[in-house]
């Protein structure tokens, strides 16, 4: 909660740590490079990987993400109460997920309520960790602005962002594309 209020916190791990995990996975699989794709927080990690481990990234696709600069890629403030709801049972998790996806889902590409409930049930059954989610949010909220780092990225880059995105405002995608020389920006209406 302190991080949401703009207070300084210490995150247990950072986006750089998670990018390093991606490189470790490449090493484990015996791959020198990969075409790296990330969505939302995954896009932040993919961007970080491309900036910090340039020799390991063959191309970058950043989807519905942002640079870490606080003036772009903001979240619709109406989502905050929904993001902070405690979901302590499977049924509560499914119900809250359904409400959340009604708010953040793509208006032009809606999921059925049944599909959202099934995905939420699968997520709960795999194991939802409130502490893990809190650590990931801390990593996002304590990330530095990557704009300067992104200027060093010199691999083919595609930035995809929905024009109706409530979770990460389209300004985040635009800023990402502007930060990477030669990046292609694909804006999707209704997403």
Q: How should these model regions be labeled?
A:
Residues 75-148, 152-155, 175:
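Alpha/beta-hydrolase
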Residues 12, 16-34:
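Conserved acidic catalytic loop of the alpha/beta-hydrolase fold
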Residues 163-165, 183, 190-191:
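Acidic beta-to-alpha connecting loop that harbors the catalytic carboxylate
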Residues 35, 58-61, 151:
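Residue in the alpha/beta-hydrolase core beta-strand immediately N-terminal to the catalytic nucleophile
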Residues 166-172:
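Conserved alpha/beta-hydrolase "acid-adjacent" motif
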Residues 38-42, 46:
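Gly/Ala-rich beta-loop-alpha elbow adjacent to hydrolase catalytic centers
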Residues 47, 51, 58-90, 132:
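Flexible "cap/lid" loop of the alpha/beta hydrolase fold
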Residues 153, 159-161, 165:
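Short beta-strand/loop motif that positions the catalytic acidic residue
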